Each structure stands twice: as structure tokens, then as C-alpha cells.
Amino acid sequence: MANQPIDLLMQPKWRVIDQSSLGPLFDAKQSFAMDDTLCMSVGKGVSPATARSWVHHDTIVLGIQDTRLPFLQDGISLLESEGYRVIVRNSGGLAVVLDDGVLNISLIFEDEKKGIDIDKGYEAMVELMRRMLRPYNAKIEAYEIEGSYCPGSYDLSINGKKFAGISQRRVRGGVAVQIYLCADKSGSERADLIRRFYQAALKDKQNDKKGVYPEIRPETMASLSELLQKDISVQDLMFALLTELKALSTHLYSAGLSIDEEMEFEKNLVRMAERNAKVFG
């Protein structure tokens, strides 16, 4: 059982699945189906701990709570008019922005005998981010940033401005700890898009829904490039990820899905498609 965040990160083997450069046709529904698939195989002990990196172009990922917005379709129409695809993920939380300047990382562990408490999974991801960003001498803090989109206790920030958010999903004995990292472009412009989405989807009900949906202040969010005043790309973060995972394990290797995993993935993708069809018709 892991006692410290570093214990979770130090694995005999790390399997890596890199989906960070699949391009605009890579649909975000595939990503959430993929993580559920990997949770199953890691949870069963068929696969070692797995790190999956993923990038989706111009996509807004809604949480289940967002589907209860009173004027949801108006909000979706606004996002689509800005050129974004909209999907609903299979877990809680609230809306986030994905584009080609945002790197997502999923760490998938076996939850052996329920040995990984929720905080430990989050703290392992925080520790990995601190290691990845150590060369930039940045002081990274983990606490909720009010005014950001999809706020949570493990928002990552520098000087009070959020650049990353962490979530967690548990499926069939596996734990997927997921982070989105805003590498470049404007963090405040991403936040303003979500602010306008909630305005359109709430209209005159904003006061009724205070505390349910965030009142977004775009100035609370920024990209790493903005915060560190350096050009930091998704590729730079990918290199840092692989470097740290290699240092934390005796064997780092890349592997696609097995035949069994492919079959499970197809089932999970159908479930994701059905979930989205219920919301979007």
C-alpha cells in the first residue's frame, strides 16, 4: 500500500500510451472510453500502471452537472458558433476547455484492496507535476482557485493563477487520475469562453444557481507559457513527463491496446456515445 505520493509514482514498470498528436479527428469521447478500458486492465493486474497522454482540438468537455443547466442548448449553440465540439464526460465536475495547447495526462493505477484513498491519487499527480516543472523554478500550489472553471481542491496555480485541474475516476478496481495542463495560448481567453457559456445557459437563473455553477473571472486563469514567461509547448511537457516516468521506474515502455482491451474499448465507446446522445439528441 502506498504511504506517500512518491510511492504511487515509483512503479516497477510504467506503460505509456501517447495520444498527444493524433490531430483534430481524435474525438474526446474516445479518451474517456480509453481510460475506463485501462482502469479495467490495470485493475485486473493484466496491465502495469499506465500513463496516457492526450490532446483534443477545440473541444468543450461538460460534466454531468452541466447537463442540468436550464438553457443548456443555448450554451452549446454559443460554443459551436465559436468552432468547438461539445461532449459530456462520464464523471462529475464541470466544463473545461481542451485545445491543441492543452496536454491531458491520465495516470492509471491498480486500487489494490482499496489502498489508494482519494487524496493520495491527487497528491501523486501534484508530485509528478512539481517534478516535471522543477527546471522552471516555479512555486506550484494546490488549492481551489475561486473564479476558475471546474474549480477543485487540487487546482494547480502559480502566483494565484490556475493553469491545471485534476480529477479522478474509479472503475473496476482501477483508478484514473486525470489532469489538464494549459501549456500555451491564453488561459484567460479559455476562461472567458466558459464564462460566456454559463451566461448563455443560465440567463436570468444565475442568482438561483449560485454555488452550483462557478462565477468565472477570466483573470484567475493563465497558461504555463504566460505564467513562466517562456514558450512552453505540449511537446515540452511530454518530454518532461517521459523523463520523470523513466526516473521513477525500472522499465518504461510504449504499448498499444491488446485484443481484449480493444474489445472493451469498443463497448465503452458505445456507452459514451449513448450517454452523449441522451444529452444532445
UniProtKB/Swiss-Prot annotation:
HAMAP family: LipL. Belongs to the octanoyltransferase LipL family. The record marks 162 as: Lowers pKa of active site Cys. Changing residue 39 to A/S: No effect on catalytic activity. Keywords: Acyltransferase, Transferase. This is Octanoyl-[GcvH]:protein N-octanoyltransferase. It comes from the Bacteria. Residues 45-253 form the BPL/LPL catalytic domain. Disruption phenotype: Cells lacking this gene are unable to grow in minimal medium. Addition of lipoic acid only partially restores growth of the mutant strain but the double mutant strain lacking both lipL and lplJ fails to grow in minimal medium containing lipoic acid. Moreover, the lipL mutant cells grow as well as wild-type in minimal medium supplemented with acetate and BCFA precursors. The active site is at 150 (acyl-thioester intermediate). Gene3D superfamilies: Bira Bifunctional Protein, Domain 2. One of its GO terms (molecular function) is lipoyl(octanoyl) transferase activity. CDD domains: LplA. GO terms for biological process: lipoate biosynthetic process; protein lipoylation. InterPro entries: aa-tRNA-synth_II/BPL/LPL, BPL_LPL_catalytic, LipL, Octanoyltrans_LipM/LipL. It catalyses: N(6)-octanoyl-L-lysyl-[glycine-cleavage complex H protein] + L-lysyl-[lipoyl-carrier protein] = N(6)-octanoyl-L-lysyl-[lipoyl-carrier protein] + L-lysyl-[glycine-cleavage complex H protein]. The reaction proceeds via a thioester-linked acyl-enzyme intermediate. Catalyzes the amidotransfer (transamidation) of the octanoyl moiety from octanoyl-GcvH to the lipoyl domain of the E2 subunit of lipoate-dependent enzymes. The gene is lipL. Its EC number is 2.3.1.204. Pathway: Protein modification; protein lipoylation via endogenous pathway; protein N(6)-(lipoyl)lysine from octanoyl-[acyl-carrier-protein].
